[in-house]
């Protein structure tokens, strides 16, 4: 049984981790996907899936929803409106392009994520961010 508070605490422990493309090592370096992968590994004890090498424009080349497809393989899809602390949210920054960013909610209005240019941080989910959420997922077996 996995408690939401445990997921939130693990996600928050990544705050301050430097950005590193394709990284997934708390305190050393991670990108947005690496942060979620690292939280998964801490919670479940092993990686769900090792992603292939990817470039910064990886999804644009194929036009496929690679990030959402991978999330669907390992996480439980939920309605965006139902997402709360401990859930994973996926963002699309530009209409007509694949979703390319992911983070973990610490509360309905708080998010831990990693973006190029700075360390992993916890931010407010402002209206700008909220409008860009296109999918939400729960970790398997999570309980309140």
Predicted regions and their residues:
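Non-catalytic ligand/cofactor/substrate-binding and regulatory segments of enzyme domains
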Residues: 1-17, 125-144
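A broad structural signal for alpha-helix termini and local helix breaks/kinks
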Residues: 15, 43-44
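Short helix-to-loop capping/linker segments positioned immediately adjacent to catalytic or ligand/cofactor-binding
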Residues: 18-27, 77-78, 100
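Active-site nucleophilic cysteine motif
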Residues: 24-43
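Short, solvent-exposed loop/turn segments at secondary-structure boundaries
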Residues: 24, 124-125
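...with weaker cross-activation on analogous glycine-rich loops/strands in unrelated enzymes
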Residues: 2-8, 49-119, 126, 140
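Short secondary-structure junctions
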Residues: 19, 74-79, 132-135
């Amino acid at each position: 049984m996995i408690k939401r508070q445990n997921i939130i605490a693990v996600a928050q422990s990544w705050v301050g981790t430097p950005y590193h493309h394709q990284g997934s090592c708390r305190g050393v370096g991670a990108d947005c996907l690496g942060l979620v992968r690292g939280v998964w590994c801490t919670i479940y004890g092993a990686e769900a899936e090792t992603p292939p090498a990817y470039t910064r424009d990886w999804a644009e080349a194929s036009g496929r929803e690679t990030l959402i497809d991978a999330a669907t393989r390992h996480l439980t899809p939920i309605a965006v409106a139902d997402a709360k602390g401990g859930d994973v949210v996926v963002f699309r920054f530009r209409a007509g392009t694949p979703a390319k960013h992911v983070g973990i909610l610490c509360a309905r209005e708080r998010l831990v994520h990693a973006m190029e240019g700075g360390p992993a941080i916890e931010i407010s989910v402002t209206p700008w961010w909220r409008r860009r959420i296109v999918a939400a997922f729960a970790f398997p077996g999570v309980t309140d």
